[in-house]
């Protein structure tokens, strides 16, 4: 049972001890493979539930979102250890981050609740993006972020926004394969242009 007075500082949800422990574990895994110089932050709305879907988890299986992200950046996990895959991702200058650093709790799964959490956390995430990550580029991989990124300038972000005509590359949507290809092409063009 969660204590409604304790809110997680990584997502803003009511948090039990297990929630905080899971957040800290995932933060530790991500930090281990954070590039010294971040080229591109791939930004999701919230962390996936399953550890196999969380790219940085110490699992052998890479599924769901993690597999789609690797496909989008051209890294194949076939016949490689997770450590090798994550090292390639790191050397490529990629960092996968989330506005809400934790999976959604059952009471936070409605569209309205997700939108409210994202709206509340966006200022803190943008500060972290500018002050800590300091990437050259940001590419959103969740359509849930479109209302919050629309209209933001390069100055507000602290980096270039790589987008699909002003929209996110919806790797969390029904046309993920098409979005993977769009992201791959847009990212290559942004790198070639020096953005």
Descriptions of predicted regions:
Residues 2-155, 159-162:
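A polyanion-binding, active-site-adjacent surface
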């Amino acid at each position: 049972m969660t204590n409604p007075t304790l809110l997680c500082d990584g997502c803003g949800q009511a948090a039990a001890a297990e929630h905080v422990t899971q957040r800290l574990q995932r933060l530790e895994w991500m930090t281990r493979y954070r590039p010294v110089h971040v080229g591109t932050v791939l930004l999701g709305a919230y962390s996936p539930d399953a550890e196999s879907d969380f790219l940085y988890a110490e699992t052998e299986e890479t599924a769901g979102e993690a597999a789609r992200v690797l496909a989008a950046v051209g890294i194949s996990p076939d016949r490689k250890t997770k450590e090798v895959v994550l090292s390639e991702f790191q050397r490529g200058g990629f960092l996968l981050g989330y506005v809400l650093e934790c999976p959604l709790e059952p009471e936070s799964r409605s569209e309205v609740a997700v939108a409210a959490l994202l709206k509340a956390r966006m200022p803190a995430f943008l500060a972290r993006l500018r002050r800590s990550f300091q990437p050259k580029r940001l590419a959103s991989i969740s359509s849930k972020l479109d209302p919050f990124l629309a209209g933001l300038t390069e100055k507000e972000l602290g980096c270039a926004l790589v987008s699909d005509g002003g929209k996110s590359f919806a790797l969390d949507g029904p046309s993920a394969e098409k979005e993977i290809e769009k992201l791959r092409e847009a990212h290559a063009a942004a790198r070639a242009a020096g953005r």
